[in-house]
Amino acid sequence: MKTVYFKDPTKENIEAAAKIIRDGGLLAIPTETVYGLGADALNEDAVLRIFLAKGRPQDNPLIIHVPDSSWLARYCEDVPPEAYALAEKFWPGPLTMILPRKPIVPLRTTGGLETVGVRCPNHPITRAVIAAADVPIAAPSGNTSGRPSPTCIADMIEDMDGKIEGMFDGGPCAVGVESTIIDLTYTPPRLLRPGGLPLEALEAVLGHVDVDKAVVSLLKAGERPKAPGMKYRHYAPKAPVTVVTGDPEASARYIQAHLPEGAGVICFTEYKVLFPGRSIHDLGPAADKEEQARRVFDALREFDHEAVTEIYAQCPDTAGLGLAVANRLKKAAGFHVIEV
């Protein structure tokens, strides 16, 4: 299959990309979080192609993307006032809300669940494509299942060139980690996945939010995921990862003392000097969680192009966006974590 590439957001390109979606094709779409692999969320055959192209387990639900909050009532039953309050404050943006699905949303899209995740992405190209197609776009991250998520078009090309009909280059992703997922079918609401919107921002609107156990550990065999990223090993490079948590100075010194020959390092900017001659990827300054979110997937993915036997990674604390960065690193490591 020859993949068509779109660069400029002209009316003609937007319409051509929307036609791919309407015709049941697959389109790589840019968002502020990561690049997505999109298809018509209401077309079961097109949705199946997402799972096949990624090698994604079919019980792993997909998020549907809409251009604005007025579409919530099209695809969700009994939308609570809290959903509209969150949408008014945080949409377009990196927030996915889990709500009861209407029958128009296929069970294939929801991984067999009676709920569906919905978000409005903060990228003008993708919102324009959705509006032109006049259907919601189901889109998980555009990587091969299990690999680090794509944050630029080069990552998409690496994983999906020749496997899908089209790719729209929208530049590098501004946030760099996937959306935060909040389940509004629970009382109190439940955080299923930390992401580009901090938990603290949600609690400022909703009050107390429970944190699902899948944020800190993998679901067990037989447990059904209610949102992407809950059950399966995700975000992983080819080399095994060990995450070291704790005070940044202490974790850096621990890695320095225990780093095996041939291993690579993901560390905060301040501690690169401790690893001369090693393969290093800079996660950003220890205090800059936004920069860490932008860099974490690039750091993990780049090690696939280097001859490292394993990877040791420093980890931020869980305040603000640190919760999302820590979650991605720990999932990449299969929750192989050393606390110092």
Model-found features: residue ranges?
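Active-site-adjacent structural elements in enzyme catalytic cores
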Residues: 1-340
